[in-house]
Design a protein with these regions (language model features):
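Hydrophobic membrane-insertion alpha-helices, especially the h-region
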Residues: 15-31
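Catalytic-core regions of hydrolytic enzymes
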Residues: 35-58, 63-165
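Active-site-adjacent substrate-binding region
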Residues: 161-187
């Protein structure tokens, strides 16, 4: 068994990652503010105040528990990086608009599903349906034997116009940062992904750079 180490991000990399998260959040807020018919009929709670829920966003931290995902040279696991990104995104999203209800597939390394890849993926889709999510966003981190491989990539369904619009905003904004480059927006028609394909709502799987490239993560 390999020991999972917590990587300390370099200050400049951390700032870039947080900036990316904020840009993604901003994209969601714009779209959600114009979302007139939400599946949600509940109220979001912040502190002692209650707000009408304008939409529910499920944030998925890829992998977790038995599944560490990709592993960087220093031992950092993908599951730790995606969890950090997911929690920070949710935190900032709720801060920017308390009317947005944020739910997660996991908030720690503990997972509630069996140690089976198929059941793992099914469980994430079921959770989105149970929470009546309006949007599903899954964080992943890429890796490659070549440490110079870089860039971020988005995966969406071919007929998912809302997610196509979201990814366009993300790519447009990220292109202005001195971080990394866009590897494109790919449809699951050619790259099947259960957590995206089985959703009936806008769904994106976003690979935020390469864990094997220390200039990115």
């Amino acid at each position: 068994m390999q020991n999972s180490k917590k990587r300390k991000l370099k200050p400049q990399n951390l700032l870039i990652v947080l900036a990316c998260i904020c840009l993604i959040i901003g994209t969601f807020v714009v779209l959600l503010s114009n979302h007139s018919t939400s599946n949600s009929d509940s109220k979001a709670k912040t502190g002692n105040k209650h707000y009408e829920t304008i939409a529910t966003v499920m944030i998925d931290a890829g992998h977790g528990g038995y599944d560490g995902g990709t592993i960087a040279e220093d031992g950092t696991t993908e599951k730790d990086l995606t969890l950090a990104l997911a929690l920070e995104t949710g935190k900032q999203l709720k801060k920017l608009n308390p009317g947005i209800k944020v739910v997660y597939t996991r908030t720690s390394d503990k997972v509630t599903w069996p140690e089976d890849e198929t059941e793992d993926l099914k469980a994430r889709v079921k959770m989105a349906k149970k929470e009546k999510a309006d949007y599903f966003f899954s964080f992943h981190i890429n890796s490659n034997e070549d440490p110079t491989c870089s860039g971020y990539v988005s995966y969406i369904r071919q007929d998912d116009k809302a997610s196509e619009q979201i990814t366009e905003y993300i790519c447009k904004n990220l292109s202005g940062l001195d971080w990394t480059h866009d590897r494109g927006t790919l449809t699951t028609e050619f790259y099947p992904l259960h957590v995206v394909d089985e959703q009936k709502i806008p769904a994106i799987l976003f690979e935020a750079g390469f864990s094997t490239n220390t200039k990115e993560i």
